[in-house]
A protein has these predicted regions:
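Formylglycine-dependent sulfatase
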Residues: 2-8, 13-15, 21-355
């Protein structure tokens, strides 16, 4: 039986929030809820909080049409514990094992725990999770079989549908997980993952820097190489299932928009956790060079685009006025987080944490 903890579920750890309170088929007593969770986005990284070197028009819309918080706090300074608290309503420091999770960590939130998704599902909502997860998968750490349905996944936590990253973009495995199994699984390239030792014959960033054609590490992040970028942890295989970093935002956002379309006639809850602006920052080419801050600024612009795609979908389907949108970051900003992307050198007076 699931334990119910309501205390923190009503706490909005928000950067900008908009209540868009026309689809006549929807029950207005149950507004849709979209929780947008940015990664490592700072208070000062958005125009609505004073950013000058990057444009965020879609987030600006949320701020101008809704409520902009100027005093809000995350429960932790890193990803895993902050997300744990948000989804469970519990302080992470009360639970062992909620520090920054490896990509092969077992599922930290246990199926018997009552989650935010459970709360919405029990109220008749369709529930979906998209993007960065970083709370473990499978029943036990390092015991996952990535070539079969995972023994524990988001379906056990109240989510009807999920399309997520197992951990973060800088940690293996570099594949999407859809409803508890590797998306676009390639049987010709079975997946193996280790956070202890490399697999024989597999190149690493430390030993084969000549293979890092997309991004090089500034410190750490020198293990397995995927898409010309070295990561934390070791993996083998993946084949066609491996993501391309420049397409992560497109893929996550497209699946989220499809979810909105599929559930436009019923109340839905969406947990939309972007990879942006976490490292490795390798946004799509169409966002490159649009600001003064290099790749980190480009990643902020890409994040804003994702927000805009959700807003556009709601507008087109007449759902905007019956949808509550909450936007937050999991924690404060990180500038140099292990890759040589010139993020610090190109701040040009920008203050990610605000002033």
């Amino acid at each position: 039986m699931k334990k119910r903890h309501y205390g923190m579920l009503s706490l909005a750890l928000t950067s900008c929030l908009a209540v868009h309170a026309e689809n006549k088929n929807q029950n207005t007593d149950k507004p849709n809820v979209i929780f947008i969770y940015a990664d490592d986005l700072g208070y000062g990284d958005l125009e609505c909080y004073g950013a000058k070197n990057v444009q965020t028009p879609n987030v600006n819309r949320l701020a101008s049409e809704g409520i902009r918080f100027i005093n809000a706090h995350a429960t932790a300074a890193t990803s895993t514990p902050s997300r744990y608290s948000m989804l469970t309503g519990e302080y992470a420091w009360r639970k062992p094992g909620t520090d920054v999770a490896a990509g092969n960590a077992g599922m930290i939130i246990r199926p018997e725990q009552y989650t935010m998704a459970d709360m919405f599902k029990s109220s008749g909502y369709a529930t979906g999770a998209f993007g960065k997860w970083h709370l473990g998968l499978g029943d036990k750490t390092a015991q996952q079989d990535w070539n079969a349905p995972l023994s524990a996944s988001l379906g056990d936590l109240g989510f009807d549908y999920s399309y997520i990253m197992a951990a973060t973009a800088d940690r293996v495995p570099c594949v999407f997980i859809e409803n508890g199994q590797v998306a676009n699984y390639d049987p010709s390239a079975p997946i193996e993952v280790s956070y202890i030792k490399n697999f024989p014959g597999e190149p690493t960033g430390k030993d084969n820097p000549e293979l890092l054609y997309n991004l090089k590490p500034s410190h750490g992040h020198d293990m397995s190489i995927v898409n010309g970028i070295s990561r934390i942890g070791y993996m083998k295989g993946g084949g066609k299932a491996l993501w391309k970093d420049e397409n992560i935002a497109d893929s996550i956002t497209a699946h989220a928009v499809d979810f909105i379309k599929q559930h436009k006639d019923e109340p839905f809850f969406m947990y939309f956790a972007t990879n942006d602006v976490h490292v490795p920052r390798f946004p799509h080419n169409r966002f490159r060079g649009k600001n003064k801050m290099g790749l980190r600024g480009d990643a902020i612009a890409q994040f804003d685009w994702s927000v805009g795609q959700l807003l556009e979908a709601l507008d087109k389907m007449g759902l905007t006025q019956n949808t509550l949108i909450i936007l937050s970051s999991d924690n404060g900003p990180v500038v140099d987080d292990g890759y040589d992307d010139k993020a610090e050198e190109l701040l040009n007076g920008h203050e990610p944490a605000g002033n």
